Amino acid sequence: MSKIHAVVLAAGQGTRMKSKLYKVLHPVCGKPMVQHVVDTMASMQVQDIVVVVGHGADAVRAKLGEDVTYALQEEQLGTAHAVSQAAPFLQDKEGTTFLLYGDVPLLSATTLSALLTYHEEQQAAATVLTAVLPDATGYGRIVRNEAGEVLRIVEHKDASEAERAIREINTGIYCYDNRKLWKALAEVKNDNAQGEYYVTDVVGILRDAGEKVVGYEAIDPEETLGVNDRVQLSEAEAYMKKRIMTGHMRNGVTIIDPTSTYIETDVKIEADTVIHPGSFLRGQTTVGADCVIGPQADLTNVEVASGVTISYSVMVDSRVESDSSVGPFAYVRPGSQIGSNAKIGDFVELKNAKIGDGTKVPHLSYVGDAEIGDGVNIGCGTITVNYDGAVKHKTTVKDGAFIGCNSNLVAPVTVGQNAYVAAGSTINQDVPDNALAIARERQVNKIDYANKMPRKGKKQS
């Protein structure tokens, strides 16, 4: 296989989106549209990816990083003009070049690989990715000769009655012989009503030069959907979501109700895990085998080991080890690590906390900036008092400790191994190993107190 290059057009402003965010940066299933395109190219081991930027160039660069090459289109003079901005980076190279659009996020590596294979088998100068639609109104039509080669692409407004009856359309996606592309591109003129340079003219230029131009029909036309407004964005989101769900289910994941579940592109889930309705799995979240996620679990960049149960809870930038349970109604904030066979129960908040194996924080507690050992019990209502108004301080609770209900651990403080903290205590000094710490007022009972107090309706003597 020859060397593969790609030009991705991402210079348009996208006024129909009616947004401050540049069009190609609008997300589909958690990832900017243009990132989907670049990632697909990267998965195909494309050697050179040149992204043509214009409006929002800095924002696009910030999202995509430095793994691609950028070409700047300062003036918007048409698609051929946009492609030509990549010439300094590609025109002297051998091989095949893809032409793609940053607002066409659904194209799969399977489809593009098939396009590439067909292009090389046909030894064509250019191969057009086409699609057959039930209603082709508004699209450029593919006109073929008797041999099935592409003669020309006719825009809808310029098409004859017979040409308008053609349902095979130009998707705008191409494979080119790289050297022939740049030679033909130099011949494109702007003698049209809009005064712009159109990349579709390259097909005619190549044909006039006696070159072979063919078309490859996409098996799934929906993959070629371009996004120009919020309606089409929602359609792309729905398609991508279905693709993601189908992939996970075919790999052995049970998704009870795909219509009420949201899973982003880069999420990984192992077999025999069950995802319940209302769950959101985002970012770089990974879920092991035999887990139960949801209902109503919201996980962002979370590492979940096998056999974990998470329900009605929010977890962000954290990790939970095998056979643990989280929820219902827990909030696990960034930097938290939950050990194996641990329990994080209802209305518990963790922040930058390390929870040991077999430790239980069953309910109504805040554990922040803390390291809790193995086999610890944190009683209901326990608070790590970590903030003095300027600095966050650390709380350490060692293995086997028992913290009674409604205790305050005022950091920095350490509770020793197998130590006890009596319920209702405010601990502001270290507790030695195996000790019992009691930090509360001794109870005093005032005998016959009630009879001495005035009450409504009670006659005073």
From Swiss-Prot:
Entry's family note: In the N-terminal section; belongs to the N-acetylglucosamine-1-phosphate uridyltransferase family.
Binding site for UDP-N-acetyl-alpha-D-glucosamine: 9-12, 23, 73, 78-79, 101-103, 140, 155, 170, 228, 333, 351, 366, 377
Cofactor binding remark: Binds 1 Mg(2+) ion per subunit.
Top-level class of the enzyme under EC nomenclature: transferase
Residues engaged in binding acetyl-CoA: 386-387, 423, 440
Stated name of the protein: Bifunctional protein GlmU
Designated gene of the protein: glmU
Stretches for region Linker: 231-251
SUPFAM superfamilies: Nucleotide-diphospho-sugar transferases, Trimeric LpxA-like enzymes
Annotated compartments: Cytoplasm
Taxonomic lineage of the native organism: Bacteria, Bacillati, Bacillota, Bacilli, Bacillales
E.C. no: 2.7.7.23, 2.3.1.157
Chain positions recorded as Mg(2+) binding sites: 103, 228
GO cellular component terms, A-Z: cytoplasm; membrane
Pathway linked to the protein: Nucleotide-sugar biosynthesis; UDP-N-acetyl-alpha-D-glucosamine biosynthesis; N-acetyl-alpha-D-glucosamine 1-phosphate from alpha-D-glucosamine 6-phosphate (route II): step 2/2; Nucleotide-sugar biosynthesis; UDP-N-acetyl-alpha-D-glucosamine biosynthesis; UDP-N-acetyl-alpha-D-glucosamine from N-acetyl-alpha-D-glucosamine 1-phosphate: step 1/1; Bacterial outer membrane biogenesis; LPS lipid A biosynthesis
Catalytic residues identified in the record: 363 (proton acceptor)
